[in-house]
Amino acid sequence: MPLPGGLWWLLCCRRGFTLLHRDYGDGELSGDGDEDEDEETFELRTPSPAGGGRGPLEVTLTQPVRSGPVSNRLQSWEETWSLIPEKGLPEDDPDIVVKGWLYREPRGGGARPWLPPRRAWFVLTRDSLDQFSSSGKGARRLGSLVLTSLCSVTGPERRRKETGLWSVTVSGRKHSVRLCSPRQAEAERWGVALREVIASKAPLETPTQLLLRDIQESCGDPEAVALIYLRNPILRHTSGALYAPLLPLPYGVSAPGPGYAPLREEAVRLFLALQALEGARRPGPLMQGVLQTCRDLPALRDELFLQLAKQTSGPAGPPGLPATQDPAALRYWQLLTCMSCTFRPGGAVRGHLLGHLERTEQALPDSELAEYARFIRKALGRTRGRELVPSLAEISALSQRQELLCTVHCPGAGACAVAIDSHTTAGEVARELVGRLGLARSRNAFALYEQRGAQERALAGGTLVADVLTRFENLAAEEAGLEDSPDSGWRLCLRLHGPLHPEGLSPDGHELPFLFEQAHALLLRGRPPPPDDTLRALAALRLQSLQRDFSPRVPLPRLDRLLPPPAPPREDPPRPTPRPPPSAALLAGALWSPGLAKRRAERARRGGAGRTAGSIAREGGGGAGTAAAVLGGWKRLRGMGRAEAMAAYLALAAQCPGFGAARYDVLELSTEPGRGAPQKLCLGLGAKAMSLSRPGETEPIHSVSYGHVAACQLMGPHTLALRVGESQLLLQSPQVEEIMQLVNAYLANPSPERPCSSSSPPCQDLPDTSPPSQRPGLDEPQGQSGCLGQLQD
């Protein structure tokens, strides 16, 4: 029987008014049953009415359910009021911390600027923040906010555009309160008082934490643990959404970082990202994004560990048989593997995770899940803090529980492939390569460097190679849209680290060509710039080692492959040049036409690559003099073997002042008042001394041997203090670990000026940057003998 028209209209209007009241009603003191459907529902149940106290299986956690129009749940304002005793304005309550008149900005005030803040009397106690209509006795209470350890306070900050007042925001579980005051001191006083009250509260525990404690207490009884999982779906795999985090996260409306939502909302988003892994075609980028979120927000790391333990437990408890048969379920184990190689879980979460892995191994000993569990348990014992999240290549290797291959370039020995994992350090890779190349008994020290063209930087021994590879991947992604260049692309290389000892090198080993190629690379970069006669002698020795004896028909490399580029001449101030007469311009145009100039430039550009020794000797001009001198020195080396030429090259290069010195840009901080602003300098670390010079100059302004360094210590994150005699020098540089390693290597190297028994203290935790000593005076040249002296005549 159809309803009468009037009754039908009344029912529709009533439903419409209900919706309007929900959407546009008083949002501060009223609510609807559906309004808080995203909040979690926690229940503490007892197995029997006669039970006294909480037993190990008494806690039951259920997911929220959507309630109908008529709900037995408390409305949001009723829930808030039910926690506060009904009483009027307290007169002399000893629990009152601070009270006074403040303005309260209405909810959504930023979106509704036409609503002005309302003035009210606020009272802060040890339990709540209460709002009253007035300060008199019997005033009506307008609202209360229960304060717990999860509440947060932000501010004070001045809202110039909205109200012009100083505001302090207190965030609770259901809503937030923004208190405003025209005076900054008043806002700061309330902010400090609110933070002190919140800090004095005992930490809250979620029901999930209580369940973890029960599982830990019942770990010796598998049946009890299985019963806990059976009665609490929150611990098991689910395909539904998670409406609240598993761990206590602070309430708050402000984002913890750019591009992020509040922590509790980000925790729910993480769970959605985990569920998206099951059907992702390319899970690597999604996994990397989840790991990056945990790196940016450390508070979510334990939360994600628990979510992964939940999703790897199976729908029927740990471990679920459907999870072992579903290939998509392996994605959770793969992400858990990456997490265990990147972050360290907290104490309680770590214990629960280890127990979960052990139960998986015992239940499915020969399955792939057991292999993942064993791999994760080993990784948790070795993982320490990482600077960057794993690269896509590392994520792919970890998903298969395999090692990652990295390529290290060794001068004179080609490229070496080294198998690493997420915990391998640069020092371990350097030691493996030193042993593989037969350099274990060498007097020279070697280290791993990152290199790109002429740029290079030593890696500290404790640096994780996986972090370096991730940085290379990020830099390559940033430069993907840029034009490719010959020097684009970072790589790892093994290099000499410290002073060079060319004596006693075996002609049949890898060390001689290794040092030979590295010394030549340093000379091509102008580190150091030796005299011209030494450069020509070195070029002749390199030709002898590469081409053997001189022959006029041997194709030669270009001069820029043998000699460093000439130093740019100093620019003199421009002088006005007289304007030539028109006749001179006409004559120049007739003798030097643009077409002739173009042809001569093209001929000069082609001239270097395909020239032979005979053609170079017949050329004239400025560059031909250097080429002729190089060829003359090469002719005098007839009969010298390749190994002998390389050894002579190293011996001559080691005699150059400042050979192998490292250069770093530093900032000098004056220790005396009134000395002005800090100045930029170059710190040079040589084999015998360290020096300071101005950028672009070759002569040092300060030079001191290591034996005269009285103290060398770290004064800050990037500040180094050097004390020589009565003077102290403060230098600032970001390359702390590199300089610390290099200076310690030089201090450990015995020298006539600083014997092994020298009492100069080693550098401890010092940060430094050193410039290549491109100036004489860092090391004094030693005498030359044999064929080395003949080459420079």
Curated annotation (Swiss-Prot):
Residues 1-18 form the signal peptide. The lineage of its organism: Eukaryota, Metazoa, Chordata, Craniata, Vertebrata. Residues 782-793 have a biased composition (Polar residues). Residues 237-399 form the MyTH4 domain. Residues 598-608 have a biased composition (Basic residues). The modification Phosphoserine is found at S30. Residues 29-41 have a biased composition (Acidic residues). Residues 404-754 form the FERM domain. Residues 95-199 form the PH domain. It comes from the Eukaryota. Pfam families: FERM_M, MyTH4, RA_2. The modification Omega-N-methylarginine is found at R638, R642. Keywords: Methylation, Phosphoprotein, Signal. This is Pleckstrin homology domain-containing family H member 3. One of its GO terms (cellular component) is extracellular space. InterPro entries: Actin_motor_Myosin, Band_41_domain, FERM/acyl-CoA-bd_prot_sf, FERM_2, FERM_central, FERM_domain, MyTH4_dom, MyTH4_dom_sf. The keyword Transmembrane helix does not apply. Residues 28-62, 554-586, 598-622, 750-793 are annotated as: Disordered. Residues 750-762 have a biased composition (Low complexity). The gene is PLEKHH3.
